[in-house]
């Protein structure tokens, strides 16, 4: 009979003890600060895009269309430049996700290769603990995080939103008066209300069937906030163009008329 505890990580041995190989070799690592350990359960294993170049190109196309959307919003351009930058910083993730959904961008991931503990120990240089100045590699996206992202996109596809509905929804997300540091927060709040009213008019909420649709749209849109922007950058952009401030990139693209 198995002695493992319920919920114990299968990456470890019986009774949640580390694997034998790790126990035998860990003594050589005691003098070296170890990075945060990673669970190797399937849902938490790191993954990477199967077609990074194609997917990154499609993601950049979505950013370009997002810039085009912002350029066609006089109410956005009339805001103070500092507020424009803060709104981009606070909402580029949900706007990008709406663009992925609207363009029906699909992608597949595969498990990323993970160096074995033995390989890490054998390749570890003694001088590395003496302050080489190199930071450990940032963890790659997990399978669970990517699957949740795909689930959110599929929820939008099931709604079959029209281009006008997508545009109204983007407006409700863009004009967020709760973003810290806004100079015109009150005015931005009014813009958000206007975008919400237009969305309601487009969905015709006085129709009983449309009322349920409006609720589903708003609930689905609320899930976008659960997707961290770090996941979007690490999954769609970092493999090809490296670490990039996407909000800053959008701001630069807006200046290129």
Swiss-Prot record:
A GO MF term: protein domain specific binding
Localization per record:
Nucleus; Cytoplasm
TM stretches of this protein: none
Q: Name one GO biological process term.
A: Notch signaling pathway
This entry carries the following GO cellular component terms, namely: chromatin; cytoplasm; intracellular membrane-bounded organelle; nucleoplasm; nucleus; protein-containing complex
Q: Where is the NR LBD domain?
A: 16-257
Signal sequence segment: none
Say which domain of life the source belongs to.
Eukaryota
PTM annotation (Symmetric dimethylarginine): residues: 57
GTP-binding among keywords? no
Matches recorded under InterPro entries: NHR-like_dom_sf, NR0B1/2, Nucl_hrmn_rcpt_lig-bd, Nuclear_hrmn_rcpt
Any Pfam family hit: Hormone_recep
Repressor among keywords: yes
Result after altering residue 195 to S: In early-onset obesity; Japanese population; slight decrease of repressor activity
Summary of the tissues where the protein is detected: Liver. Low levels of expression were detected in heart and pancreas.
How is this chain modified after translation?
Arginine methylation by PRMT5 enhances repression activity of metabolic genes in liver in response to bile acid signaling, by increasing interaction with cofactors.
Q: Which disease is it linked to?
A: Obesity: A condition characterized by an increase of body weight beyond the limitation of skeletal and physical requirements, as the result of excessive accumulation of body fat.
Q: Which family does it belong to?
A: Belongs to the nuclear hormone receptor family. NR0 subfamily.
Cited function: Transcriptional regulator that acts as a negative regulator of receptor-dependent signaling pathways. Specifically inhibits transactivation of the nuclear receptor with which it interacts. Inhibits transcriptional activity of NEUROD1 on E-box-containing promoter by interfering with the coactivation function of the p300/CBP-mediated transcription complex for NEUROD1. Essential component of the liver circadian clock which via its interaction with NR1D1 and RORG regulates NPAS2-mediated hepatic lipid metabolism. Regulates the circadian expression of cytochrome P450 (CYP) enzymes.
- Assembly with partners or alone: Interacts (via N-terminus) with NEUROD1 (via N-terminus and C-terminus). Interacts with ID2. Interacts with RORG, NFIL3, NR1D1 and BHLHE41. Heterodimer; efficient DNA binding requires dimerization with another bHLH protein. Interacts with RARA, RXRA, THRB, NR5A1, NR5A2, NR1I3, PPARA, PPARG and EID1. Interacts with HNF4A; the resulting heterodimer is transcriptionally inactive. Interacts with DDX3X; this interaction disrupts the interaction between HNF4 and NR0B2/SHP that forms inactive heterodimers and enhances the formation of active HNF4 homodimers.
Q: What is this protein called?
A: Nuclear receptor subfamily 0 group B member 2
* Source organism: Homo sapiens (Human)
Q: Which gene encodes it?
A: NR0B2
